[in-house]
UniProtKB/Swiss-Prot annotation:
GO terms for molecular function: toxin activity. Residues 23-26 form a propeptide. Contains 4 disulfide bonds. Residues 1-22 form the signal peptide. Pfam families: Toxin_35. InterPro entries: Spider_toxin_CSTX_knottin. It is found in: Secreted. It comes from the Eukaryota. It comes from Lycosa singoriensis. Belongs to the neurotoxin 19 (CSTX) family. 07 (U7-Lctx) subfamily. This is U7-lycotoxin-Ls1a. Keywords: Disulfide bond, Secreted, Signal, Toxin.
Length: 78
């Protein structure tokens, strides 16, 4: 009986450690991912750049994306 309990606990611990390790490996956000709530989550050589959105002069919030560091987008002149 003790062997079954010990084996079950060891298996649970192993599965938990594997799950935590898998989460840590894929922790960074790739290029083009939304980073509005996680500004520091972009992968290396990427930065989280934010833009305020407006519709008909009314602010509709802020949107952020992971883009290459130093890259800037600008509004096209109409």
């Amino acid at each position: 009986m003790k062997l079954i309990i010990f084996t079950g606990l060891a298996l649970l611990l192993t599965v938990s450690l594997i799950d935590v390790e898998a989460q840590n490996e894929g922790a960074c956000l790739p290029r083009g991912s939304v980073c509005t709530t996680n500004h520091a989550g972009c992968c290396s050589k990427l930065s989280c750049d934010c833009y305020r959105r407006f519709e008909k002069g009314v602010e509709k919030g802020q949107k952020c994306w992971c883009i290459p560091t130093g890259l800037r987008y600008s509004k096209e002149k109409e």
